[in-house]
A protein has these predicted regions:
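Charged docking surfaces used in two-component/phosphorelay signaling
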Residues: 70, 161-337
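N-terminal Rossmann-like NAD(P) cofactor-binding subdomain of oxidoreductases
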Residues: 1-194, 229-231, 293-294, 298-304, ...
Length: 337
């Protein structure tokens, strides 16, 4: 019998946590015992996993020494509290929040881009999962960077409300229903009405005029590519779509590269689906439930001699969070456990 691993999911009742549960089953991850953890409020809720019923436990009462691997998606404050405790018990923590991403001695990993960085988990038994928008962009840009190098990235994102969790999904649904029935729309989760609207602010505003979400893309790109010379100029926009993020990516390369060569490279890249000609991916039609990154509208930039433009789409809850975390765990048990 192949080795099995006891897995804990912190934040099991959230959008990402529930999706991690699905992905573990779909990818047949070798789970021995499964521990679903959440706050006292969710204690006792049950889920089905591999034909069995699993009960949600109160994280405050959990013995971390029972787990080998833990997947965290319960928010930065809970990661800050519980990840070091779990790690001290020998658990390898894969954290979906931003809390540990920018610490120099912890790996920030996209398995298709920098799987070798996983080895750094030995520093503190913690691996950070990048921001959803960074993940899909870098999966698409990795082969270009390897081929000719990247100097600068201009990117505009069009991010669905599921990036704000279940509360974001509920707010879009509720506002849409009210407005279509002639009622005023209440806003709680977003700074402005999200139904039938676009909001060019995700996360808090920083002193430099960028949002924290935008600066995440800057910091994470440089760390994952291990190249602080790459400049990144993002604008992140929340759009009234339930699932899936899209990005208009404009890249300036160190050496010119033809669009057809980019297409050829991407067609050979693990985890990428290329759309050709006038066919292009969209969040609503293509992204939902997919674990890979979709790229279309690939063309040379008519305004720059070394420019390439791409349209990049992915399911932010899966590849942008849950699937990427499970893929990290797969590499971990294959190469390091």
């Amino acid at each position: 019998m192949s080795q099995q691993y006891n897995v804990a999911i912190l934040g099991a009742t959230g959008a990402v946590g529930e999706t991690i549960l699905e992905v573990l089953q779909e990818r047949k991850f070798p789970v021995g015992e499964l521990f679903l953890l959440a706050s006292e409020r969710s204690e006792g809720k049950t889920y089905r996993f591999n034909g069995k019923t699993v009960r949600v436990q109160n994280v405050e009462e959990f013995d971390w020494s029972q787990a080998h691997i833990a997947l965290f998606s319960a928010g930065g404050d809970l990661s800050a509290k519980w990840a070091p405790i779990a790690a001290d018990e020998g658990v390898i923590v894969i954290d979906n929040t931003s809390h540990f991403r920018y610490e120099y001695d912890l790996p920030l990993v996209v398995p298709e881009v920098n799987p070798e960085a996983i080895a750094e988990f030995r520093n503190r038994n913690i691996i950070a999962n990048p921001n959803c928008s960074t993940i899909q962009m870098l999966v698409a840009l990795k082969p270009i960077h390897d081929a000719v190098g990247i100097e600068r990235i201009n990117v505009s994102t069009y991010q669905s409300v599921s990036g704000a969790g279940k509360a974001g999904i509920d707010e879009l649904a509720g506002q849409t229903a009210k407005l279509l029935n002639g009622l005023p729309a209440d806003k709680k989760q977003f700074s402005q009405q999200i139904a039938f609207n676009c909001i060019p602010q995700i996360d808090q505003m920083m002193e430099n005029g960028y949002t924290k979400e935008e600066m995440k893309m800057v910091w994470e790109t440089q760390k994952i590519f291990n190249d602080p010379s790459i400049t990144v100029n993002p604008t992140c926009v929340r759009v009234p779509v339930f699932y899936g993020h899209a990005e208009a990516v404009h890249v300036e390369t160190r050496s010119p590269i033809d669009a057809q060569e980019v297409i050829n490279l991407l067609e050979q890249t693990e985890g990428v689906e290329v759309f050709h000609g006038d066919d292009f991916p969209t969040q609503v039609r293509d992204a939902g439930g997919k674990d890979h990154v979709m790229v279309g509208r690939i063309r040379n930039d008519i305004s720059h001699h070394s420019g390439v433009n791409l349209w990049v789409v992915a399911d932010n809850v899966r590849k942008g969070a849950a699937t990427n975390a499970v893929q990290i765990a797969e590499v971990l048990i294959r190469d390091y456990y």
